Regions:
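Active-site and donor-binding regions of nucleotide-sugar-utilizing enzymes
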Residues: 16-36, 41-216, 229, 233
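Absolute protein N-terminus
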Residues: 1-2, 166
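Membrane-interacting alpha-helical segments
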Residues: 3-7, 11-18, 22
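Charged active-site motifs of nucleotide-sugar-dependent glycosyltransferases
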Residues: 45-51, 78, 223-228, 238-240, ...
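Charged catalytic carboxylate motif
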Residues: 9, 62, 240
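ALDH superfamily catalytic-core signature
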Residues: 161, 214-224, 235-243
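Short hydrophobic signal-anchor/transmembrane segments that target glycosyltransferases
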Residues: 66-73, 240-253
């Protein structure tokens, strides 16, 4: 961990001037780069802050219901939402401008950036979606006694193969997490195999299944229509169902 922090800091300090010069010549900077450095103005959030992080669009959308339910359940707490991409920021503002108390970028995983971020946000608890594992951030959360959770955790097969090569490194990282909550039993086993403590790793349902689906094309008034639902059909069964539906439609015109 110490080696990681030293090397990442050196690499960051060496590359930052070069990056800034190139971007200045092009007149275009990485979206949110100042915020990621810890240079942002945050409102006075107090000492009751729940922080959610989703790196981009998919993760942010998956967090929607949980964030809104958290706000309803804990109205005395401030909600902070962070993302790692511009598109993530856009969807976060679209979804949570009336729910979150502050929306910003997640910091670079460099000591000074993480320290500035945590000082300004002062979270009481941090919940990070899916597979965002940041060693320095996790270490500072533990140092400051901030509970840190992975929620909706998942690891793809390709990521699992890569992480397995340095599972000793990840074993150290997971010591800083309070709990790992995964999407499935398979994901749970993957997390454990790359170093997550079994006693800290549990299965939760996939948050994406909780996302509200709005049917804009059909409004069904209960009790006035005959409705046939065909789910999980196999090859050859669709034709049989459609044939039966056509026969019913002739006899009962309100069949849908």
């Amino acid at each position: 961990m110490i080696i990681y922090r030293i090397l990442s800091t050196i690499l960051f300090l060496v590359s930052l001037p070069f990056y800034a010069a190139v971007r200045a010549c092009r007149g275009k900077y990485l979206p949110g780069w100042q915020e990621k450095l810890g240079k942002f103005h945050a409102p006075d959030l107090g000492d009751k802050v729940i922080m959610f992080h989703g790196v981009s669009v998919g993760e942010v959308i998956a967090l929607e219901n949980l964030i809104k339910k958290t706000k309803e359940t804990f109205p005395d707490y401030k909600i902070v939402v962070t993302t790692g991409t511009k598109t993530g920021q856009e969807i976060a503002h679209k979804k949570f401008d009336n729910t979150a108390d502050f929306i910003t970028y997640f910091p670079f995983d460099i000591t000074i950036c993480v320290e500035l971020f945590l000082k300004k946000i002062n979270p009481s608890i941090v919940l990070i979606a899916e597979t965002e594992l940041w060693p320095t951030f996790a270490a500072y959360c533990r140092k400051k006694n901030i509970p840190l959770f992975v929620i909706n955790g998942r690891i793809s097969d390709s990521t699992f193969k890569s992480y397995s090569l340095i599972k000793g490194f990840f074993k150290e990282i997971f010591k800083n997490y309070t709990e790992i909550l995964t999407q499935s039993e398979e994901d749970k086993e993957k997390f454990i195999k790359i170093g997550a403590p079994a006693e800290k790793t549990q299965v939760m349902k996939n948050l994406k299944f909780d996302v509200k689906r709005i049917d804009a094309d059909i409004q069904i008034e209960k009790g006035k229509n005959r409705i046939i639902i065909a789910g999980s059909t196999h090859k050859g069964e669709d034709e049989i169902i459609l044939s039966a539906f056509e026969k019913l439609k002739k006899e009962f015109s309100d069949t849908k």
